Design a protein with these regions (language model features):
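A common structural junction motif
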Residues: 108-109, 258-263, 360-368
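An extended, acidic, His-containing surface patch that forms the Zn2+-binding/catalytic region
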Residues: 97-99, 204-207, 266-329, 336, ...
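Short amphipathic alpha-helices in soluble, non-transmembrane regions
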Residues: 245, 355-363
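Acidic/His- and Gly-rich active-site-bordering loop/insert found
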Residues: 29-135, 148, 154-163, 342
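A short core secondary-structure module
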Residues: 182-187, 235, 240-264
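Acidic/histidine-rich catalytic neighborhood of metal-dependent amide-processing enzymes
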Residues: 131-132, 138-217
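Acidic/histidine-rich, surface-exposed loop or edge segments in extracytoplasmic proteins
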Residues: 42-52, 231-234, 366-374
Length: 470
């Protein structure tokens, strides 16, 4: 009997988490050691200048940008609109082979950016100090151009293919994907017939303090979002004469209880395996503690140190983040209603309804309404040994015998739409980043180094060729 975790055979999980696989030589040399990298820089700068802040999205402008490129390259393409101004771009490079197609997935929308806080205008796409600056440089306009260059490079050089390559740029990912990948999977499933693998954001190459690669990460599973809105009601009036039971006061008390609340620690088998595999990167006591994280967390001193690091804490517990508060729009008006948006991320296997019931008890005020804004079930990627092998060989070829690990994704991506249909969707774009670099995603002064971007273009092409070239 084959043992599985989250639907993935133990043998494959072992390969993912420990990855001590001997590299094999690629069947063919890479198409080009240096694709049109200067062209790619110009494309990325232009792409960043297309403001696709969601809301409202306006991805139609980005879709038209890509369509012009594909038309120029002679690649089959079409724009698929899901709502006014909301669009997805689909392009397909067809092969003569019978192998299942591969999708290069990315999203075209970006989160808002406050220009007053940035050193460079967030939609300038300026190239300065060795970086390309702008919202989306990392999430996910930079990776989209990396994927684009793989497709058009292989088309230009007439590489014989054993599988179709699909480029898919979606709308609305930053708001849950209902108008993007969700819409396409529901309304246009024919576009994905015969698809065997999807590559998306969610993994990459992690650097150490010395600038050298420490390990590669592949996204195979993610925490699931449970976005909530808490609403309190009370007597409205003039700010000069406050009454008891004000909506804002009730909301603040409830939010304070949430801030004080500590969700329980749960070490899932997938997480235990990830830290055990990552233990080789640690030294001293930390190595043995990571080797058996569940046991180590019973030590209060280690637990306090470990949970102090946000990315570690989020890997072993449900998280609750207050992300927005709304009351009156005038200083001297007491509102009848006050609300707060809450971003909850649940570990795989958690029941959203049960979690909300527990949250109500923490809040301790039955008059506060709890509304679900977004929720969907967790989905772990079905296995795809060939993709893992291609990523592992890429690591060995360029960075030696370093681990390839599968951490639990703390955010969510469009992958879940494909995983729910049984299609393997792996998070991996070969861009190099540090722990501190994560703060640039959705943060101030988002930027990608030109060197990193150009290397990713070469590495992505190398990996895609391994998967689809004859």
């Amino acid at each position: 009997m084959n043992q599985t975790i989250g639907g993935i055979p133990m043998a494959l999980l072992s390969a993912i988490f420990h990855v001590v696989i001997c590299a094999t030589v690629f069947a063919a040399e890479p198409v080009s050691r240096r694709p049109a990298e200067e062209e790619a820089i110009a494309l990325l700068r232009h792409y960043i200048q297309i403001d696709t802040t969601n809301p409202p999205g306006n991805e139609i402008k980005a879709a038209q940008f890509f369509k012009e490129i594909f038309n120029r390259e002679g690649i089959e393409t079409k724009i698929i609109e899901s709502a006014q101004g909301r669009a997805n771009i689909y392009a397909r490079l067809r092969s003569a082979g019978a192998k299942k197609a591969i999708v290069l997935l990315n999203h075209m929308d970006v989160v808002p950016a406050d220009a007053k806080l940035w050193k460079e205008p967030p939609f300038s796409g300026v190239s300065k100090d060795g970086y390309i600056w702008g919202r989306g440089a990392l999430d996910m306009k930079g990776p989209a151009i990396v994927e684009l260059m793989s497709l058009i490079s292989m088309k230009r050089q007439g590489v014989p293919l054993k599988a179709d390559i699909i480029f898919l740029g979606t709308a609305d990912e930053e708001a849950g994907g209902a108008l993007g990948a969700g819409f396409l999977m529901e309304k246009h499933p024919e576009l994905f017939e015969g698809v065997g693998l999807v590559l998306n954001e969610g993994g990459g190459i992690r650097l150490g303090g010395d600038g050298r690669a420490r390990y590669y990460t592949v996204g195979v599973a993610e925490k699931t979002p449970l976005w909530l809105r808490l609403t309190a009601t009370g007597a409205p009036g003039h700010g000069s004469t406050p009454r008891a039971e004000l909506a804002v006061n009730k909301l603040v008390l409830a939010l304070n209880r949430l801030i004080q609340y500590q969700t329980p620690v749960k070490v899932l088998p997938e997480v235990q395996k990830f830290y055990a595999a990552a233990a080789v990167l640690e030294s001293g006591a930390r190595r043995s503690q990571f080797a058996d994280l569940q046991a180590a967390l019973k030590d209060p001193l280690f637990a306090a140190e470990f949970l102090k690091e946000p990315r570690h804490s989020a890997s072993v517990r449900n998280t609750v983040a207050i992300t927005g508060i709304k009351g009156s729009n005038k200083v001297n008006v007491i509102p009848a209603q006050a609300s707060a948006n809450i971003d909850v991320r649940l570990l795989p296997g958690e029941d959203p309804t049960a979690f909300i019931d527990g949250l109500r008890k923490v809040i301790g005020d039955e008059s506060i309404k709890v509304e679900v804004l977004l929720s969907f079930p967790p989905a772990t990627s079905p296995p795809h040994a060939e993709a893992i092998r291609a990523i592992t060989e890429l690591a060995r070829r360029h960075d030696g015998n370093i681990p390839v690990l599968a951490p639990l994704g703390r955010g969510f991506t469009d992958c879940h739409f494909f995983r729910e249909k049984g299609v393997p969707c792996y998070g991996f774009i070969p861009m190099r980043g540090t722990d501190g670099g994560e703060s640039l995603v959705h943060g101030i002064d988002e930027r990608v180094s030109v060197e990193n971007f150009q290397w990713a273009i070469r590495a992505m092409l190398e990996m895609v060729q391994k998967l689809v070239a004859e």
